[in-house]
């Protein structure tokens, strides 16, 4: 129905432009939305307020001209001006019941549209370094990215989900060397484990798997491994005034880099055994963890596969005049495209930078023919946006194709206290631990219930509580309640008959029932808005509101009554609520239980 109203308003704009009331180049960015207050009709447009300045008249005066030119719209009984210049549209009574037919006909597909059918979108998300298990921060990116992809697909887009595997960087070398040092320890070689190495027990498990397969084939003298390696960092026993460690001597970065270099030299090709064993073990763990979380990918893209693409990207930038040499390094002129400073893409030792890999990766994405590229990054990567967009423009592509969505950090709270989390020390709360504590449903739901750029305080106690304060429980309970109601009805002579029930829909004449019908009809619009804004929380909030309307109505009004017609009508309304709840929960990756 909103499509028909919008078409009528578009017709009015053309007429007013022809009459010279609105400029011929006026861009209509007004909105047509469902009203929250039934006394204001079913739909409201702000077109008169948006266009008043361009028309050079007061909003209400322009609204009168709009109404005078408005063609007849089927099933609209009246349109009137309200407040500062809103135009409210009222549906006839029969049209309010049309949503019941739409939901019954479309079932699990109700709400889905083809508004983004011409888009081919790649959504890259999580992309955590394969150096340890996923932590709760990665979990938010996983839930958010998967749900954004679901929403885009539900609005007709062709979507590819991709995980970028950072399998060629320094962190992988730190992990490989950490594994090698644990390997030496397990084979009886005493050593002082580096402070900057990966500390978790999983490193020992990977090392043991290599021992089980190859024995002591890679054992070398610890003295040789540590030969000429800069001193590791030494900290004072007491913290400074801000609670930070005080460095007395040494350098943890130079220390681990020295160990990496020595390990590579001493065991030669054997180093790859540790690198690949660690990569496979961690990546398999990540894949299993995400699959159990309901998060899947169409492609796992290896950074190591980009060698030739890096050369191609840098050659393209050079040919277009955007590279220069300074102090032995090769720099990209990113400041020409709005970045705050130029960026190194190749160091004087010939090694390309992580940024060079990023440029090559985005070149590869663009060459795959996507109309839109969506990158979902941790908020700490905010500074990378300008330089990546600069590189895209410099290579001759359109950086507006790239949308970067930042995901803020997550804090866990239990018993009113924040749960501490860190990484290399091995003392971090994993996604798997969170899922085991609160369940997949609560994790998937609460991870997306705020805008991605907003911090989340995840209340573990609330997430497992069985109360209306726990939104996911409240929504799921509404679904289960309807299942139980239908089961009870079908066990008696009040068995639900959909065809018969539709004949009695006009018995749904309570204000609460009219409100539920309007809320059901609003779902497709909410879905489109949520998809185009990359805001899954809009679906979550909608489901909370729909569940609240249903619970309130159910608690106040008996569904299974002695009146057969009324019972059938109310069961019909309940069944449609059930379907929409299930559809919305499915998009969020949350189950719709039949019993609770």
UniProtKB/Swiss-Prot annotation:
As for family, the record states: Belongs to the class-I aminoacyl-tRNA synthetase family.
| Catalytic activity, as annotated | tRNA(Arg) + L-arginine + ATP = L-arginyl-tRNA(Arg) + AMP + diphosphate
InterPro entries for this protein: Arg-tRNA-ligase (IPR001278), Arg-tRNA-synth_N (IPR005148), Arg-tRNA-synth_N_sf (IPR036695), ArgRS_core (IPR035684), DALR_anticod-bd (IPR008909), Rossmann-like_a/b/a_fold (IPR014729), tRNAsynth_Ia_anticodon-bd (IPR009080)
| EC number(s) recorded for this UniProt protein | 6.1.1.19
Q: Which PANTHER family match?
A: ARGININE--TRNA LIGASE, CYTOPLASMIC, ARGINYL-TRNA SYNTHETASE
Q: Cite the SMART domains for this sequence.
A: Arg_tRNA_synt_N (SM01016), DALR_1 (SM00836)
Q: Does the keyword Aminoacyl-tRNA synthetase apply?
A: yes
Q: What is the annotated quaternary arrangement, including any partners?
A: Monomer.
State the taxonomy lineage.
Answer: Bacteria, Pseudomonadati, Pseudomonadota, Gammaproteobacteria, Moraxellales
Tell me which domain of life the UniProt entry assigns to the organism this sequence originates from.
Bacteria
The record's subcellular locations are: Cytoplasm
**Keyword Metal-binding recorded:** no
User: What Gene Ontology molecular-function terms does this entry list?
Assistant: arginine-tRNA ligase activity; ATP binding
**Which species does the entry assign this protein to?**
Acinetobacter baylyi (strain ATCC 33305 / BD413 / ADP1)
Q: Which GO terms describe its cellular component?
A: cytoplasm
GO annotation (BP), single:
arginyl-tRNA aminoacylation
Q: Where is this motif: 'HIGH' region?
A: 128-138
According to UniProt, the name of this protein is Arginine--tRNA ligase
